[in-house]
Amino acid sequence: MEKNVIFFKNIKFYNCSFRQILYKIKFGGYLVAPAASSLSKICSNKQYYNSLKNSTVAIFDSGFFCILLFLFKGVKVKKFSGYLFLKKLINTELKNKKILSIDPSRKESFLNKKYYRKKKIKSYSYIAPFYKKNFYDVKLFKLIKQINVDYITINIAGEKQEILAYEINKKFKKRKLKIICTGA
């Protein structure tokens, strides 16, 4: 599978199937699906760039980025949206699993809980504060410590969710959490 890894600015993008990507995070780590607009800011946002470089898997969520890779580097990759990844994950992997959904608002949290309930997935939710620079969220870390979840989905804004995933992964490395950042 390593032949399906494309490095861009030391970020490991995987041009693989859903199953192969899922296997990469099976033993813990975090998946990111950066937008082209966010990738354009990696030189000015070091914290964001560091979180992408340290991700377990980055997927080609941006069709524009895929086109640019082909035009400028001659590298042909297949777009794999974060939405599609999350949809497949929910429909195939999350039955009888527990999930923590980190949401930007009460409304989003309510809608996600309702959706997970319909899919018969045990879910917990956390409404994230508005993070500025410090992503070390003690309240969130206490919740993660209390509940034993299989997956964490982070549904806050891009350039923030990836940094939060990095902090969670660093704090709970031994728990082997599977963290999914697919967009707000």
Where in this protein do the model-derived segments appear?
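N-terminal nucleotide/polyanion-binding subdomain common to many enzyme families
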Residues: M1-K78, Y83
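Proline-aspartate-enriched helix->loop->beta-strand connector
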Residues: I144, N148-G158
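Short glycine-rich anion-binding loops that position phosphate/pyrophosphate groups of nucleotides
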Residues: A36-L39, I156-K160
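Short Gly/Thr/Asp-enriched flexible loops that form oxyanion-binding sites at enzyme active sites
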Residues: K113, Q161-F172
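Short, flexible loop segments at boundaries between secondary-structure elements
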Residues: A128-K132, R175-A184
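Short, conserved loop/helix-junction motifs that constitute active-site signature segments
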Residues: N50-K53, L94, K170-R175
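Conserved beta-alpha
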Residues: C66-L143, I147
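Structural motif
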Residues: L31-A33, I59, L100, Y151-N155, ...
